[in-house]
């Protein structure tokens, strides 16, 4: 039974035998052509190499710049604020202690994802309109620091 099992047709591709005479179709130069860089051993050309000519990616002009004065804010959503007890004061120091944010970056921005049902005092650098409305609607306070 086991000795009769064969793989599905064309499932196992036979390897191309190189340099085995002119009758094989890949004799003599083994499909590498005559001389030149690509015929040598260890032929590895990096992607985009154009034979010494200035490559396309270097010919096109550079665009844009990196703004070093850009401010990045740590994001805090209402779903996270919902986990705090009622009437608690949420500050960047508290968020760092509880490991809710790893790095305050340029400050903290509170976003409006989720719902808030608890009255809280939130101190942060920025608030989205939706987050601000949600905190105030429940009777909480907002302080921009």
From Swiss-Prot:
Residues 20-30 have a biased composition (Gly residues). One of its GO terms (molecular function) is rRNA binding. Residues 1-50 are annotated as: Disordered. Pfam families: Ribosomal_L27A (PF00828). Coiled coil: none annotated. Belongs to the universal ribosomal protein uL15 family. Binds to the 23S rRNA. Part of the 50S ribosomal subunit. This is Large ribosomal subunit protein uL15. The lineage of its organism: Bacteria, Bacillati, Mycoplasmatota, Mollicutes, Acholeplasmatales.
């Amino acid at each position: 039974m086991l000795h009769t099992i064969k793989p599905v047709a064309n499932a196992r591709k036979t390897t191309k035998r190189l340099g085995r005479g002119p009758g094989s179709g890949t004799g003599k130069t083994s499909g590498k052509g005559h001389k030149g860089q690509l015929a040598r051993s260890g032929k590895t050309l990096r992607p985009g190499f154009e034979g010494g000519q200035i490559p396309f990616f270097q010919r096109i002009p550079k665009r844009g710049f990196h703004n070093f004065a850009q401010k990045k804010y740590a994001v805090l959503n209402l779903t996270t604020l919902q986990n705090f007890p009622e009437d608690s004061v949420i500050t960047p120091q508290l968020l760092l202690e509880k490991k809710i944010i790893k790095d305050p970056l340029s400050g903290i921005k509170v976003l409006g994802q989720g719902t808030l049902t608890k009255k809280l005092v939130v101190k942060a650098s920025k608030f989205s309109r939706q987050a601000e409305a949600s905190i105030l609607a429940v009777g909480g306070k907002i302080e921009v620091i």
